[in-house]
Every structure is written in structure tokens, then in C-alpha cells.
């Protein structure tokens, strides 16, 4: 509660979030019962969450985000290096960042983490595509996952959550395709045919259902290139099996490089996503933004 002594909470709500009204009701009850002052700001368009965070950061103790990874991406980018702690009320499809940080998916428990949690500094990635910067907490990528994001209808994501991606993902794997990737990691070039190229800040997907690669940490001052290069749909399924089993000893199909700066270009050009939001088309550059974000996470019991 000491983090809340500098002013009220600012609760930024994406009304398109899954169960937004129900989550807000739970959060209001928890904050009110604790005697904590809070303000609400409901977004109306892309970029609105970042505008709210930038405009009000100096007047509030904590910014709380109700939404998915895309809404969270906007807020942490706007607050980068401000030292302002960010709480999360998960309301997205995957909630990948919240899950990786141990945030409860149940609304009342997540709201209590806002009140009783501890601050945790974390790196961000700063992606530039088409001259525009986009911060991300989880990953930026091109390839099969981007096509899956683009082709899964919004109503399916709202109804089924992460399971809504499953059928689309299977279809993309069976409709197997690759592209030529030209990459640099800290100035060192790499060229490979690939089905997926990801710059990851967090390695765990859906509570370790999949692990993107070895030794990926969000607080080590580095990001991680994860290049997946199966030669067929059958090999692509094998790559997923390896990710589920955390077996990464297949250099002909899996390439991993840690670094601080990356460039990615593709032939043919590929759509780019950052934390679940489509942000442009290759080429793009990424830099690590060390310790840029501060999240409220659950206390660890002794």
C-alpha cells in the first residue's frame, strides 16, 4: 500500500477487453473496500491508453491497465523510464505478459496485487518500423504467429480467449510457407529461410505451455532472437513439440542469439507484430530498453 501514497490510482480501461464491465466492477469493489482513491479512463481509439498514461502519470501513484497485451504495450511505452509502477488487470486474449509475471487471471485477486504487490523492474524492446517507435514487453515477430493474429476474428478471440487462436494456428501450420530472413544481432549478420522470426523479451507462453527458447529473461539487459526454420509442416509440428518439452538442440531448425540491437528484413516482405498488435511491414529494427518498465507483481511468500 505504500506505493499508493503519492496519489490516486489511474485505472485505464479498454472497453473492448474480454469481460471488461465485470472486471471493472470487481476492481472498484476491491479498491473502495481498501479505501483507495482511483480514477477511471476508458479508451476510445488506438493510442488512447498511451495518451491517458502520458497526461496523468505525474498526478497518480500507480497506473493500472485493464486490457490485453496490446493495451499494456501502449501504457508501458508511454511510461518508459518514468519509474511509475504499472498494475495489470488481465482482460485480453492471451494476457502473455500478465501470466509471465504471475498476475492472477481472476479480477479480484489481480486487483489485490495492485494494492499489495511489489515493484519489479523489467526491460522493454523498442521496435522501429516505418520510422515509428513501438515498445513491447513480450515480443516482436514476423511469420506464422503474425498471420494467425491477422486471421483470427475478433469475436472468436472474445468468446474463446487463447483457444480462439488454435484453429487458425493449425491452419497456418498446415498451409506451410517460409520466407528469406536477413538479420543482424549486434552487427553480426545471419541469413536463413524461416517460418518465424521473433525478438523475445519473455520466454514463457501461457504458463510454460510453450517456451520460446533457452535462457530468455526480461531483466538481463538483452533480448533474444528466436528463429524457427522447419522445412515442412511436419517439422513445424516437431518444433512446437520441442518448445513444449524445452528441447532446443536442433540447430538446423532452431537458431537463438541474445543481443541488444537487431535488424530484420524479409523477402517477400512480412507483416510485423509487437505484443499482439500489427504495427507495419518489414524491415524493422529493435533495441533493448534496459529496465524501462516497472510492474507490480505478487509478493513471494517465505
Which role fits each region the language model picked out?
Residues 43, 185-186, 191, 217, ...:
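ATP/nucleoside-binding phosphotransfer catalytic cores, i.e., glycine-rich phosphate-binding loops
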Amino acid at each position: 500500500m505504500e506505493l499508493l501514497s503519492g496519489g490516486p490510482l489511474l485505472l485505464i480501461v479498454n472497453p473492448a477487453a474480454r469481460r471488461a464491465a465485470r472486471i471493472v466492477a470487481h476492481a472498484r469493489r476491491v479498491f473502495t473496500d481498501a479505501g483507495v482513491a482511483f480514477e477511471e479512463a476508458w479508451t476510445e481509439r488506438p493510442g488512447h491508453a498511451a495518451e491517458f498514461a502520458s497526461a496523468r502519470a505525474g498526478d497518480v501513484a500507480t497506473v493500472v491497465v485493464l486490457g490485453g497485451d496490446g493495451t499494456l504495450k501502449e501504457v508501458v511505452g508511454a511510461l518508459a523510464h518514468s519509474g511509475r509502477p504499472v498494475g495489470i488487470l488481465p482482460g485480453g486474449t492471451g494476457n502473455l505478459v500478465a501470466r509471465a509475471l504471475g498476475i492472477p487471471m481472476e479480477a479480484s485477486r489481480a486487483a489485490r496485487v495492485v494494492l499489495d504487490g511489489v515493484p519489479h523492474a523489467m526491460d522493454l524492446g523498442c521496435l522501429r518500423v516505418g520510422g515509428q517507435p513501438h515498445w513491447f514487453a513480450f515480443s516482436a515477430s514476423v511469420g506464422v504467429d503474425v498471420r494467425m493474429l491477422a486471421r483470427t476474428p475478433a469475436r472468436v478471440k472474445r468468446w474463446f480467449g487463447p483457444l480462439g487462436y488454435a484453429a487458425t494456428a493449425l491452419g497456418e501450420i498446415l498451409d506451410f510457407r517460409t520466407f528469406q530472413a536477413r538479420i543482424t544481432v549486434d552487427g553480426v549478420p545471419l541469413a536463413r529461410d524461416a517460418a518465424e522470426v521473433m525478438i523475445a523479451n519473455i520466454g514463457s507462453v501461457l504458463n510454460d505451455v510453450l517456451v520460446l527458447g533457452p535462457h530468455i529473461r526480461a531483466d538481463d539487459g538483452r533480448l533474444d532472437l528466436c528463429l524457427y526454420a522447419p522445412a515442412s509442416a511436419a517439422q513445424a509440428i516437431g518444433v512446437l513439440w520441442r518448445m513444449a518439452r524445452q528441447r532446443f538442440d536442433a540447430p538446423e531448425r532452431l537458431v537463438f542469439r541474445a543481443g541488444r540491437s537487431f535488424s530484420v528484413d524479409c523477402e517477400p516482405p512480412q507483416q510485423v507484430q509487437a505484443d499482439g498488435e500489427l504495427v507495419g511491414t518489414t524491415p524493422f529494427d529493435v533495441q533493448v530498453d534496459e529496465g524501462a518498465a516497472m510492474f507490480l507483481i505478487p509478493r513471494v511468500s517465505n
